[in-house]
Amino acid sequence: MNSLTSQELKDFAKNVVGVDAIGIAPIERFEGAPEYMSPRTVFPEAKSVIVFARRIIRGCYRGIERGTHWPSYQVFAYSGLTKLVHQANYRIGRFIEDHGYLSVPCPPAATLKEAGPRGPVSPGGKYPRDVNVSLRIAAVLAGLGEMGWSKVLLTPQFGPRQRLGLILTDAELEPDPIRINRICDRCKLCVRDCPGNAIDLKKGNTFTAAGVSWECNDLKLGKCKLTHFGLNRTTSPHFVKTFPGIYLPMDEQGNTWVEGWNFGHSLFNAVPTWKAFSAYPIAICGARGCIISCMNHLEKRRRIGNIFRHDFTNEKPWRLPEKPLVGHEDHHGFVYDPENSGEVTGSVKSDWY
């Protein structure tokens, strides 16, 4: 049985599987990680952490940026590309196991702090069985890129435009150097253009691992999740059409991440577009600030490698009114008028629909 080198693994992943970037971190870089996020809690014998990226096609953001077509991002680039990442994880895992080493896939999931225990807490002071390794932190430690102010991973090739996969293995592979503070220039356009006002302008959190430190904003996870799920009127025409009288100002919401998750799932069946999308992981906001504005800025400043012939956009992001229309409450709570040919009241008349 042949041994496995880092270069052999990378050549297979890039040239055969088709991943766009791949990096390797030794398990020692994760020393001090909380047990509920540690690779060693998942696989104590792990010696290497492999993180790879598949790019998000830039054009997938065009429909949401124009306000005309959500499936190109939601179905294709978000949930669809995630499935391709899983396929790549499987093929790379087979390659590793063909060389006699174990391959442990770690798909993305909410952490214990975000979602809470999904079952009874184990006796004896053990952590609940909800260990999830942070793919973004692992990507930084594997040398793939850095975390921008928004907390989104930025790579030298694509900026914020990729989905990540992670594999733990007992193969001892040559690691890649950590590279940080090279891409994000703290322009803070992600703050300005986040429709949920979830990205803090000044307040940050410092992360330290493997002897390096970096700072990201103190993200308001609850507001992020509400907007991500389409509960923000300013960027979700689907919500406005079904709930024209509901007012949910993002700045006044104090929910947790899991409250936003549960609230969104409780409403998906009520909104036809969401009901269709909810068979997949849902992302109605389209990452307007944390990806689109960031990507556009980094391309214009030539801070990333994947550059195009034309700017993605030179327009400010569109927004719908946050408040219901003046006079909307004239329906007095009724939704049907049998004396006027069954006219349905309370609906918003707009060329969006």
Question: Which residues are covered by each model-predicted region?
Answer:
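Charge-rich alpha-helical segments
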Residues: 331-335
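Non-catalytic, usually N-terminal nucleic-acid engagement modules in DNA/RNA processing proteins
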Residues: 1-90
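Intrinsically disordered, low-structural-confidence terminal and linker regions
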Residues: 343-353
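C-terminal/domain-terminus segments
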Residues: 292, 300-330
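A cross-kingdom feature that marks long, compositionally biased intrinsically disordered regions
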Residues: 339-341
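Short conserved micro-motifs at the rims of enzyme active sites and ligand-binding pockets
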Residues: 61-63, 234-240, 301-307, 353
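Flexible, active-site-proximal loop/turn residues at the rims of small-molecule/cofactor binding pockets
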Residues: 28, 56, 173, 200, ...
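Catalytic cores of enzyme domains
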Residues: 33, 74-75, 81-296, 311-313
